[in-house]
UniProtKB/Swiss-Prot annotation:
Assembly, per entry: Heterohexamer consisting of three BphA1 subunits and three BphA2 subunits. The multicomponent biphenyl dioxygenase system is composed of a ferredoxin reductase (BphA4), a ferredoxin (BphA3), and a terminal oxygenase (BphA1A2).
GO MF term set: 2 iron, 2 sulfur cluster binding; biphenyl 2,3-dioxygenase activity; iron ion binding; monooxygenase activity
Name of the protein: Biphenyl 2,3-dioxygenase subunit alpha
Protein family (similarity comment): Belongs to the bacterial ring-hydroxylating dioxygenase alpha subunit family.
Chain residues that bind substrate: 217-230
Lineage, broadest ranks: Bacteria, Bacillati, Actinomycetota, Actinomycetes, Mycobacteriales
Main EC class the enzyme belongs to: oxidoreductase
Organism: Rhodococcus jostii (strain RHA1)
InterPro entries linked: RHO_NdoB-like_C, Rieske_2Fe-2S, Rieske_2Fe-2S_sf, Ring-hydroxy_dOase_2Fe2S_BS, Ring_hydroxy_dOase_asu_C_dom, Rng_hydr_dOase-A
PANTHER family: 3-PHENYLPROPIONATE_CINNAMIC ACID DIOXYGENASE SUBUNIT ALPHA, CHOLINE MONOOXYGENASE, CHLOROPLASTIC
Catalytic activity: biphenyl + NADH + O2 + H(+) = (2R,3S)-3-phenylcyclohexa-3,5-diene-1,2-diol + NAD(+)
Amino acid sequence: MTDVQCEPALAGRKPKWADADIAELVDERTGRLDPRIYTDEALYEQELERIFGRSWLLMGHETQIPKAGDFMTNYMGEDPVMVVRQKNGEIRVFLNQCRHRGMRICRADGGNAKSFTCSYHGWAYDTGGNLVSVPFEEQAFPGLRKEDWGPLQARVETYKGLIFANWDADAPDLDTYLGEAKFYMDHMLDRTEAGTEAIPGIQKWVIPCNWKFAAEQFCSDMYHAGTTSHLSGILAGLPDGVDLSELAPPTEGIQYRATWGGHGSGFYIGDPNLLLAIMGPKVTEYWTQGPAAEKASERLGSTERGQQLMAQHMTIFPTCSFLPGINTIRAWHPRGPNEIEVWAFTVVDADAPEEMKEEYRQQTLRTFSAGGVFEQDDGENWVEIQQVLRGHKARSRPFNAEMGLGQTDSDNPDYPGTISYVYSEEAARGLYTQWVRMMTSPDWAALDATRPAVSESTHT
């Protein structure tokens, strides 16, 4: 027996958007965004299929499931999945759905198991997702081919400890998908030969906003950090003896837009005072001076990359975001067009002193967590925007995303990709351009045809 694809019922759903109409929602040339991309239910349904159904999505960190049988549950879009370490050390990701009536195979957040049994009718699966036992099989299901009734398996690949999964067999491998973005990810993931480890625990909370607001901010928006958005958190975190006048936003920095793919990042260069106000003196000293920082400079190829990049933000399209230096990593799981579920954890250098690991844990809880002082600022802004967009007139005029238009460098000797000033929306335009590409391309062959005919940078 072979699987048959079942089309979802369309009753009560709005008709799909035509590709030509989707293409008009984002104007990269002028930096205009149609607000309906954040609210339209039909667009969201197409996102689940065309973006979340064929992008590489963050599943977690390898150290969260170190032993055979270790597992954690997660999501790919709105599809629940299981992430399981196998006996041979590999990791499998499969749909957390029993093939009998669609119940979750596993309802726990994580743990260690030798098998998984559906709580509805007792169908049992091994840690690889293979159906191994069916109650009353001989009497009730004579001739059942159990090998045909395992859950849908995803592709799994890792990059320096981070686990990613993809439903699409035709998607490029993870290394190709990340491209030059790996250069910027390494500022957090490759500071030491020991790599990174995840601090135990995942924080989860809900924000009533569209996923693209969160992804875009971490991709492109240092602008809000340099104005008034986080002023209260900065004031609350000022170390003793430091005056606010000493913490004027740095003026030197860059923003990175992926040549292709929608990834983006940005950071200040040189001035550590903003990091000091966010993470305190212990983390700032660890990041900027001493043996660990010097080792990072050697591995990353320059003192600037190892010790002088501050307050970096980054998004791997579509929904994997992180803040090197602060070291929070999160996935923005969509829950309809008007809500996200945030899953966040913290990584540290695996060979960092235990007291530094504890300092990172405490500081990320204070700053970027469900109750973090900076997290609250961001969430409040996104929620308020989403509420305003309930109005008809509020959705009737385009948003302005033209900051930094025409002010880019695609041949920077130190940093790969398209480079602009730190206060820019170049990376945001890249994210939304990739959104249009994926929403209007029928398959990965069509997507690959949109790649620029240039070789990838050789920066290391």
